[in-house]
Amino acid sequence: MELNPQHTAVIAIHCQGDIVSGNGAFAPFFHDQVVSRNVISKIDRLLDNARESGMTVIYTRVAFKPDFSDLNANSPLLKVVEQAGCLKEGSELADIIPELAPATNDVVITHQRVGGFVPELTAVLEDRGIDTLVFAGVATNASVESTARVATDAGYRVIIAEDACSAATPEAHQASIESLGLLAEIATTADILGASSPQTV
């Protein structure tokens, strides 16, 4: 695997308290696998390496107005948001978790759908000449897969950091990875770290 840092972005998906933390609204769905797969530390390594090598670091986060007037709960996942009143803009659990806090030059994209490939993300990628996207985050079979599918259809080279993603169950994760293998490159954190080299002047 080869990566050109100048044209590569690492995208961390939904690393928010309500989604990945033990006290979050989605903890009954996702927390056990986040912990057992050691996802947070692997994402942290990917992001640190991306910054050191000169890649673009992007976070996508899903959050809604305090009155939820921008929430269209047309799917079971979004109905959970509606029922739990979670992922509310301005709440601590809607923020990126402190362990993965964005650095000054990182990009944070906020959206209101399950997938995060929104016009704001497209604009950042085009402005920076990005053609390769490395995805990590939660959940593999929901937001990661949804965003990655749109990205590959848009013509980007897509790489899934398989061991830096998780879903509600190992089976759901594996089924998603098998589907994504038809559309993207499936790699490990070690593969991606090994393909990255520090930016030279």
Indicate residue ranges for each PLM-predicted region.
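Active-site-adjacent betaalpha module
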Residues: 1-9, 45-53, 70, 77-201
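Acidic/histidine-rich helix-loop elements
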Residues: 20-36
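Short, surface-exposed alpha-helical recognition segments that flank or form part
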Residues: 34-38, 112-113
